Amino acid sequence: MSLNMTRRSFIAGSTAFGGLALVSAAGMCTGCTTASPSGCGKGKSRSLYNGVEVGCITYSYRSMRQKNAEDIVQYAVEDGLGTLELKGEVVDEYLKRGGARDMGRLPALRKMFDDAGVSIHIVKYGGIGGRNEKEDEYRMAVAKALGAKCITREVPKAAEYETIGRRCAALADKHGVYIAFHNHTQIDALTYDGPLLGYSPNLRINFDIGHYVAAITDDATRFIDPLAFIEKYHEKIYSIHLKDRTTKAHGAKNLQFGKGDTPLEKLFPFLQKKGWPFYCDIELEYAIPKGSNAVKEVARCNAFCRKAAGC
């Protein structure tokens, strides 16, 4: 599909993809648990590879000139993805096109993604659990309307663990939607042993394996192998962010998949062996090569994942 295709013609024809790869929005990682474990992009999702479902966070498309909801749908299909972690800003822009925020537009937004065979498993609202209760209720309403079972936000500062943890727990419990914490390089293998996740079973981890690798030092009391980290916290992990970073000793660089220190090639057979149904979301953060763009690079990352998963 050409990126020069008009948005109108793309959306009009997107129902053709629905019969091939429509993902049910109900339940956690539905495709991972119901599709054949030997499937490669068939059945529930076009990016379900031998039991591991690959998507991307739509932050990956931030460098594209056009990045509203219609564009995001087109990019996901072109990249061969059947599921997304959708940035909240994309939803907000869609709902405000008439001026005031119109919640009545949410069914049409969901239908547009569903018709293209692209599910939304997470909505990213980095500020959820803050002081704005009205906005938090809106964010929960968005997630439920779009079929997402989780909202992600950043890991708070240690001094805010209790405040943010309790607020997020109350929201997650009230609405039946997970809230998962996304890490940068501030966590170690002990972070989630503390109180942050203890306020509710609905508080989860969005594990960024690349950022974790970039934080690793020689302190064996604070850092363990990233696959051992997943083993330790597998009951609390909802999704994994995929990027290939080098360790701190190697400059903590963001590199193309397969060129850094992050064990992405080992990750897929590891998850397949364990049978853990985590969404694995590409997050494009390395420098885009000259002559390429974010859509082409996400496709490159997806091809890497597909191969690593044995497809």
Task: Give the ranges of each region predicted by the language model.
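Histidine-acidic metal/acid-base catalytic patches
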Residues: S2-N4, R8-A25, T33-T58, R65-G82, ...
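Acidic/histidine-rich helix-loop elements
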Residues: Y59-S63, V91-G99, A214-I216
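Short beta-strand segments at enzyme active-site cores
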Residues: L84-G88, I120-V123, I151-R153, Y279-E283
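Charged helix-capping and loop-helix junction motifs
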Residues: G99-P107, E135-Y138, E162-R166, D219-L227, ...
